[in-house]
Amino acid sequence: MINGLGRMKNWLWIIGLFFVLSLHAEDGHRFWLRMERNALPADVSLSESTERTATLDIASRELKDFWKGEGRVLLRVSKDGVMRDGFTICRKGLDVELSSASDNGVLYAAYDLLRRQQAGDLLSDGVAVTERPSYDIRILNHWDNPDGTVERGYAGRSIWKWDELPETVSPLYEEYARANASVGINAVVLNNVNAKPQMLSTGMLRKVAVIAEVLRPYGIRTYLSVNFASPKALGELSTADPLDEDVQRWWKKKAKEIYRLIPDFGGFLVKANSEGEPGPQDYGRTHADGANMLADVLAPYGGLVMWRAFVYQAESPDRACQAYEEFMPFDGQFRDNVIVQVKNGPIDFQPREPFSPLFGAMQHTQVMPEFQITQEYLGQSIHTVFLATMWKDCLDAETYRVGGGTVADVTQHRVGIHSRSAVAGVAN
């Protein structure tokens, strides 16, 4: 009897072991899109006035695969629809209509409808809901290097396989694009702000163009971090002085090359004269001189310059004041297609610090907040931290500028005729 019980326990252990081995942990690849694919496609169609595009094909495919509703889903792009990537979802009986002024807006509406389905928050008959993003540009900054390493990266190596591109295109690129589009991200910077000059070589730009082609149908524009000394570092000029005519011609030629390969290229992110990175101050010039030179080069193509205000240098007597002291004298002197990108705090993504005074002080320059998603000072890959509360504290903080306004208010406001509002997140 005792031997029989022992054998039974052994078998139970073996069965339990096989059961454990058959379990599969969530690997994160499905993101929030953990939906079972339909056995038969849902009824999804475009309105008669809506032309088929690659972006609308994605919206249609997502709904056909995962929408469980019994009625028809109609996708409509209309010039009188909600602007700035906004959308309206309207329920009429069993049918649902998704409308926007842009293809991207319809794609965001499709993901919002699926989110509501997942959350059990479906609209009642006759009810319509309209959503508008607060910022024109919702951009991720990746600090990825050409060799595959990631600065302040705590989630493995870079997904950009530069050594395989342009011949081999990883399926992760589209998976990445889908995840971003599903939460409204519409722009990405592919490489580290401590940029290698080689990122602007013709060979690398051809590889960037392949990634941009994958991201484009998901409504995502591609940006690059650039090394300000690239004309000199690549051995083509003896200087990188932004007021030198040869330097200006070099950048114009490079911009022409980029837009020939990537017609919807977003623009440049620049870290200059900070932590040893080169910049216009190396030649006695100002941040405005450097940013405006690049802005003039990109302006004919609709490109932007995001010029970082993180200008920490060890010789500064007060690190918390340095960005304010270097940028405030030039408020109002930046081109309309320049956005000064300001870290949420005056130091460096600290767990607790006040918001940067530049948000309220620079009233004549477009500024944008830069938040850190990768947890450099908050446990890195070890701890799970709910970051949204910290960001909300910053965005909701009153700046006490003339006329009042929170950080969110002043950064969502467009300063110039051609300005665009933006918010950045530094991601693994």
What residue spans do the PLM features occupy?
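Substrate-binding groove of N-acetylhexosamine-processing glycoside hydrolases
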Residues: 260, 278, 285-428
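N-terminal secretory signal peptides that target proteins for export/translocation
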Residues: 1-8
